[in-house]
């Protein structure tokens, strides 16, 4: 089908709309995101740090990762951020302050000993500048822990629809992090989910907000959906008749 169209421009209004619609269903459908949160929590545990004075989490969503963190370490003060104002209703940790708005323009009155984010980094408009900002907000012993995804993320969707989000390369991320931090740890993996049908894949993406892409997307007509279903089954079926969807998370811990 040729090279996939990489979507570099992030439509913040559309992201808010799609993720707000997905929030009531997110915890049930976000299987990969649960695993990613567990991996991030494991990486934090491996540092030997069990308590943090002030934690900042970007892109907290409905709080899945926040709760995983709270079960892993003790935190004196939380600061949570999300683009969607309604996310404040899902907060279950305290004491906490919440900022609704763009992570990259968020005002700060304090520094942090842990800045973290799960599956939100790919939505940032200027990731290189954001990394520099984070480095400036960390205390001397602070940790920056986050994940994003490799350019190979969701290859099934990219192959069939010829569209996909733009993800910075691993090399670019390591370069940016290396310029801002003295030590950087990287880990990558594949998370392969299986579904009964391609339509279930689309429902999963909708219920987790992953469809928050620019407005010029084609409408899912009945004929287009049928073509998608057939092409997906032909290329990405398992021996038992299910279909796959592959996430390729990249994890980074920087000091």
Curated annotation (Swiss-Prot):
Q: Is the S-adenosyl-L-methionine keyword given for this protein?
A: yes
Q: Pathway, according to UniProt?
A: Cofactor biosynthesis; biotin biosynthesis
What Enzyme Commission number(s) appear in the record?
2.1.1.197
Molecular functions (GO terms): carboxyl-O-methyltransferase activity; malonyl-CoA methyltransferase activity
Which top EC class is named for this enzyme in its record? transferase
Reaction(s) this enzyme catalyzes, per UniProt? malonyl-[ACP] + S-adenosyl-L-methionine = malonyl-[ACP] methyl ester + S-adenosyl-L-homocysteine
Q: Provide the alphabetized UniProt keywords.
A: Biotin biosynthesis, Methyltransferase, S-adenosyl-L-methionine, Transferase
Under Pfam families, the record lists:
Methyltransf_23
Q: What Gene Ontology biological process does one annotation of this record name?
A: methylation
Quick one: signal sequence residues?
none
Q: Which domain of life is it from?
A: Bacteria
Does the record bear Ribosomal protein in its keywords?
no
Coiled-coil stretches, from where to where?
A: none
Q: What does this protein do?
A: Converts the free carboxyl group of a malonyl-thioester to its methyl ester by transfer of a methyl group from S-adenosyl-L-methionine (SAM). It allows to synthesize pimeloyl-ACP via the fatty acid synthetic pathway.
Family label:
Belongs to the methyltransferase superfamily.
> What name does the UniProt record give this protein?
Malonyl-[acyl-carrier protein] O-methyltransferase
Which organism does this sequence originate in? Porphyromonas gingivalis (strain ATCC BAA-308 / W83)
